Amino acid sequence: MKVLHIALSDRGGAGAGMLTQHLALLAQGIDSKVLVASKRTDLDSIFQVEPNQYVWGKGKTAQFLQKVARRMGLCLNRYDRYKRRVYKIRRQHWTEFSLPITTYDLSVHPLVEEADIINLHFVADFLDYESFFRKVHKPIVWTMRDENPGLGGFHYSSTKSELYSYFADLEDEFADIKLKALTSCEHLHIVALSQQMRNFCAQSQCFAGRPITIIPNAINADNFRPYRRHEARQHLGIGEDDLTIAFVSCAIEDERKGFRELALAVQQLEAQTSRPINVLCVGANEYNGPVPSNCRFFGHLNTPNDLSAVYSAADVFAAPSHQESFGKTVVEALCCGTPVVSTPVGIAPEIINERNGALYRIGDVDDLARALHDVFNRTYDKESIRREAREHFLPQSVAKQYIKLYEYVLASATSH
């Protein structure tokens, strides 16, 4: 069985989830390969698509005319026209908003042609829906890394609710393009990373009537392991008796990640205690809102060891996101034995309980402060927290679930 994963990149949150799944399948003896637009690893089983595989204009003359037109501010094709409209609005209302049409024609790639089954992942701004689903008739499994495939250009329904009026025409046009393209896909099986994502997919018009299976992200617990608390704190320069919260996000200023609410909740707690409260923040930082007095920004930490040190130094990991497809940082923290305070999004409501943390209401600063206070004042069995998380998200377990699904989808496609 030849499996081809298609993803925008092998890095980032979605890319890391795909990569762990791919490596776990290889470990199970599956012929698994990956096709990406941007390759950041040096793995031989991952291939970057050639930039000249366009839907239109493969010839040198067409490419030259396209380059000249762009310099003159002209749009020769629908992709450029849509791109200009999107960027014009995004300059005023920044958010992730992706086109369902691209300049790639992945249907003609040799890896696509040789695959028995294709597993799509995060493919925004890479997959051209119209050409791909019209030309590719192989069985497809689609792992939902966010909600974009079931929307128009938005990546999360919460953002759509907030900004729809500014993107209304484009959102509706893009959703219609996706819906029409997907009608050509005969053998499509959806994989949701959590029950919440399954509910979204079941309600999306794009996936009406499609089979959906829940398979969580694989997390390599050997990469995320607890450090001795005092050693981690000593390494980071944190007092042994300080109250410490960890927060991780690709972009700290992303309002969907909820750092503003965390900062306000910590300010409440600081007024209630004489003990210092440290907030350890990991991720790109262009945030300019309220900041706790003892807040340290580490930028991006590229190795699991560095992240594990931050998780292990914290008394609690805070996950105040408004929406998540999965929430892998929650699982990473648990794998380090650190209790979690989280909103009930992604995988959190399925795994967070009184033994490993607490849930609180989305956007409720007072409730977040209460939950953090409660966790600070409880004792947790860190080894038990780690063991439960490790067992639930083992890569080999997740790989076996995918293999079983691939076999089922292939058999179903053959019987039709």
Question: Where are each of the predicted segments found?
Answer:
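A short, well-ordered alpha-helix in the C-terminal region of glycosyltransferases
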Residues: Y380-K404, Y408
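Conserved donor-binding/catalytic core segment of Leloir-type glycosyltransferases
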Residues: E186, V191, G239-K257, A263-V266
